[in-house]
Design a protein with these regions (language model features):
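Extracellular/periplasmic catalytic domains that process cell-envelope and extracellular macromolecules
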Residues: 102-103, 160, 206
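Covalent nucleotidyltransferase
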Residues: 13-135
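Short, structured patches in soluble enzyme cores that scaffold and shape functional sites
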Residues: 73-75, 110-115, 141-144, 170-172, ...
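Phosphate-interacting basic helix/loop segments used at nucleotide- and nucleic-acid interfaces
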Residues: 7-23, 140-162, 195
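Amphipathic alpha-helical
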Residues: 1, 142-190
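Classical nucleotidyltransferase
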Residues: 24, 30-34, 38-71, 178-230
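A residue-level signal for beta-strand positions that form part of recognition/binding surfaces
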Residues: 3, 20, 66-68, 107, ...
Length: 230
């Protein structure tokens, strides 16, 4: 299983602005690693309802069978309907209708190449050169910035355009962990976690799920009541 590089929060470690720093919009989509064998989630689960994207990548992986693409399943036209993207890509036995909907609504937005030997600018230029142009996919646009203030101004533009925030990419190698080579601007605090269990409800909630047990990337477990942002 390939663990993608995860972002640290910006401002938790100084950035050397004398080196190249790139900013891109932060997508509120579903993280997806694409290889010649298929499309996979952060947890290594295969996405079964992305046949239209696989079709557009057949020739690419025939030429570059060792390439590993990192991106998100997303559609900016559905930025306010994230649940629809989730519903479509999580289907394990998609019907013909599911496949048609996914073909219309789910795109692959590529933003990195899993390669621990190249800096980000080299990886990004490779993506621009070799990832096919298709209606089902795109390579995310990056902007080179020279200061925190410039990055913050661009972040405000991304928010005004309806994006979740912004991502800063340092011109350093890809790391298979949470890394300061990748940092995120957001206007609210959150954490990323997986459901690992649940506790039964009590009283009037007996027979129902009371709360989910979550586990974050550092191995910390905590409870999350239903409807509280899981």
């Amino acid at each position: 299983m390939i663990k993608p590089m995860l972002a640290q929060k910006v401002n938790t470690k100084p950035i050397d602005w004398t080196n190249k720093v790139f900013v891109q919009p932060k997508l509120d989509g579903v993280r997806c690693i694409f290889t010649k064998d298929g499309a996979y989630s952060r947890a290594g689960n295969e996405f079964k309802n992305v046949a239209h994207i696989k079709e557009d990548l057949i020739d690419f992986f025939r030429k570059y069978p060792d390439a590993i693409l990192d991106g998100e399943l997303y559609n900016h036209a559905l930025k306010d309907n994230f649940e629809k993207i989730i519903s479509l890509v999580k289907k394990q036995k998609p019907t013909d209708q599911d496949a048609r909907e996914a073909s219309n609504d789910v795109q692959y937005h590529v933003y990195d190449l899993v390669n621990e030997d190249q800096d980000y600018e080299s990886r990004y230029n490779w993506l621009l050169r070799y990832v096919p142009i298709a209606s089902s996919m795109t390579v995310i646009k990056n902007t080179l910035v020279e200061s925190y203030d410039e990055a913050q101004m661009l972040h405000k533009v991304h928010l005004a355009q309806g994006y979740e925030g912004s991502i800063l990419r340092l011109n350093k190698p890809y790391e298979l962990k949470r890394s300061y080579n990748l940092q995120k601007f957001k206007d609210f605090s959150d954490t990323e976690a997986f459901i690992v269990g649940y506790e039964a409800g009590k009283g009037k909630f007996e027979g129902l799920i009371g709360k989910f047990i979550m586990c974050d990337d550092d191995g910390n477990e905590f409870g999350c009541p239903i409807g509280k942002g899981y």
